[in-house]
């Protein structure tokens, strides 16, 4: 971690981008290395924006969704394809070589399905989306063959549906970064399920069920060979599970805290107000967790078996809650986006190249930026279950 930790400690603002129209920045994805160097950002006004990753200049925008966006991700083997999912019941694929054009693929399932999470497998072959709960009963994992050309929707390309593993909104879907058949899903029912899709149907594919004890907000694969799962809950709980222990008698839980906000207090005492998310730093083989305060202050923390350790506090950037971040290992840069509509690029020893001081948002602008798509649910009723090594375990 030493080399990366030194870089994190030296971060300062290098670039700053603000849209003409105020909006919340909800999620960010980086185009795979070796391409034209694009960042995709999902916004609370249902648009997807493309930025140059080095200058943050806006290079394009996609409009087509009519509901809250639940994420964006670039394909790996076809990095000119960008996917976005939405509560409007569609997952759309865009060609980033033609900014502003219509989606080249539109994936749908049942008209009653509203997606609140999605992901693409590491082989780009399989697409999966998690739905909101329907009629206070069912929620679904929907699978498509992403290689089939689907325009106009209509449910074309749907391979199947899992319907028994969650009992509430499926807030997270995460494919394993290296294993195309390994999938993790998280829900407001408090459960994180791990599937091996090569094993057959839903019951056979379910390898483990872990209980977060609260509504699941974020799930990330991490650790050596990505054998661990980081789970952050909507009420700021943190859980780290080692799936490498599935076939042993050792416990899965590496670390667990029902409220992680005070685990790594900054110099002025207290703790963070919320957790933004986590990211596995491949080059350093360490897990980075980012937390923040409502005034925009950010705290970079390392997470391991001992809990959280503060690495760096970033100030003078955002003016309100930060909603997304990513670490660009090749570019040695941190990218953050938030409810103040700002996209920031932090680099070691960076000197801000945009003119003028940080513009404080007026209360009127803040109100204008609020929308149903931007409201992050902080707690939901959940069912109590212990984790299981597989579905047949007691």
Map each language-model feature to its residues.
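Beta-strand-rich domains and repeat architectures in extracellular enzymes and scaffolds
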Residues: 18-44, 276-277
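WD40/WD-repeat beta-propeller blade-loop signature
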Residues: 24, 35, 58, 68, ...
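Conserved strand-to-loop turn within each blade of WD40 beta-propeller repeats
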Residues: 42-45, 85-88, 96, 123, ...
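Loop/turn segments within WD40 beta-propeller blades
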Residues: 28-36, 73-80, 119-126, 174-181, ...
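A short helix->beta-strand "capping" segment at the edge of beta-propeller domains
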Residues: 2-24, 55, 307-314
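Loop/turn-rich, solvent-exposed surfaces of beta-rich toroidal or solenoidal domains
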Residues: 232-236, 257-307
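WD40-repeat beta-propellers
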Residues: 48-52, 85, 91-96, 139-145, ...
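WD40/WD-repeat beta-propeller blade N-cap
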Residues: 16-25, 62-69, 107-115, 162-170, ...
